Amino acid sequence: MIPDVSQALAWLEKHPQALKGIQRGLERETLRVNADGTLATTGHPEALGSALTHKWITTDFAEALLEFITPVDGDIEHMLTFMRDLHRYTARNMGDERMWPLSMPCYIAEGQDIELAQYGTSNTGRFKTLYREGLKNRYGALMQTISGVHYNFSLPMAFWQAKCGDISGADAKEKISAGYFRVIRNYYRFGWVIPYLFGASPAICSSFLQGKPTSLPFEKTECGMYYLPYATSLRLSDLGYTNKSQSNLGITFNDLYEYVAGLKQAIKTPSEEYAKIGIEKDGKRLQINSNVLQIENELYAPIRPKRVTRSGESPSDALLRGGIEYIEVRSLDINPFSPIGVDEQQVRFLDLFMVWCALADAPEMSSSELACTRVNWNRVILEGRKPGLTLGIGCETAQFPLLQVGKDLFRDLKRVAQTLDSINGGEAYQKVCDELVACFDNPDLTFSARILRSMIDTGIGGTGKAFAEAYRNLLREEPLEILREEDFVAEREASERRQQEMEAADTEPFAVWLEKHA
């Protein structure tokens, strides 16, 4: 079922230095909660400065939804330690609150008033909050409080030059972008391996169903928890953070200009469904506009092509200007077994898998084949650990045992691991392969199986509160390693100053400014 990459692997083994200098970064979301697990209703902690302009710590949908961001880093251990420092400082500066250690929220009812993230009075800040108002009115606030981890990855220029020859300028932009689209297509075809191994949301609290009927064959515990016995990541299911209205947009991942055109079209396409919400009610703006996407970031995707934007530039315009710079992987649940929601094993696996995706042949995909890949993902999401589970290739009818496909993939990954270990020293990547391949013969080793055992014993709430308490105590006691207290104080002050400067620089009323940006 997986493509034959033997020639590409042989090429890689002859050019190991092509992988020297992989860059990566992490983003981790987490809800601030009280000791009893309920959502914190306090504002963003003062010690963390301005959520609008802070370099490392911001907020996502809700005022209580923290987001930690590491700088781009070539060293895995350094990146994870930096992330841990962000958690350590925050844990010491959030009073009696804790960080929720699971992707799925629990003690939140749909009717509960979840405060949207606040970013001050600048037009940019008000625009960000209005975008979130639109998300709330379109999809409900509860869905937006689901948390995840994003892993950003880029291959070194040496890789592209070894693979594509001496490239520069427009030629480099085209060839590197084509290479990253190959990664994305392979990710859609085989990325289900990520929720299989690392999915950690096999259950939901009853409040999450909001009383709506569901066709999923949930089992229910006495404490009101709903779970699927073989599920891996309900966060990635239709119950979680997906957007059904986007499924017929026809956006594909074959060509930079085609992709950007599809994205720009979605921003201009009116939606009958969202038009019913209205734009304004009783003098209050309800959404930026009533198009299928308010802005480009609303496009739901398990992986995104990215380029760092310049001031005032949209993500798609940045891609048109310079091509794809890096890939954002968005299918990771919060790792409940790590105080920082992600660990070294996961990062090393993603390095291996991204390199494999860059090497493996990836025929172009139509929007219909893209939809067919969703079948495999859904199977793994809802019943990935089921004995005898099979997967297909695209829209073809042939089926293959997941267990065998996983082992075949890891046979390739082991060779990538040997190459990465040869240039980095040690056997860290090979060790990860040996640890994870065991999950195919023994699904009880997967994150979802391990966390479900705990949830069945103590419920989602009990499990979440116990982990949150343990991690709070641990992080508060650990000393900072890379950053210093004064670095956080300086960034707090600098971020507040940057926000004040933005607010002072605005000359147009928000309503006038919005007409130009809506």
Swiss-Prot record:
Pathway: Sulfur metabolism; glutathione biosynthesis; glutathione from L-cysteine and L-glutamate: step 1/2. It is an enzyme of class 6 (ligase). Keywords: ATP-binding, Glutathione biosynthesis, Ligase, Nucleotide-binding. One of its GO terms (cellular component) is cytosol. It catalyses: L-cysteine + L-glutamate + ATP = gamma-L-glutamyl-L-cysteine + ADP + phosphate + H(+). One of its GO terms (molecular function) is ATP binding. One of its GO terms (biological process) is glutathione biosynthetic process. The keyword Nucleotide-binding applies. Pfam families: Glu_cys_ligase. Its EC number is 6.3.2.2. Belongs to the glutamate--cysteine ligase type 1 family. Type 1 subfamily. PANTHER family: GLUTAMATE--CYSTEINE LIGASE. This is Glutamate--cysteine ligase. It comes from Escherichia coli O139:H28 (strain E24377A / ETEC). The gene is gshA.
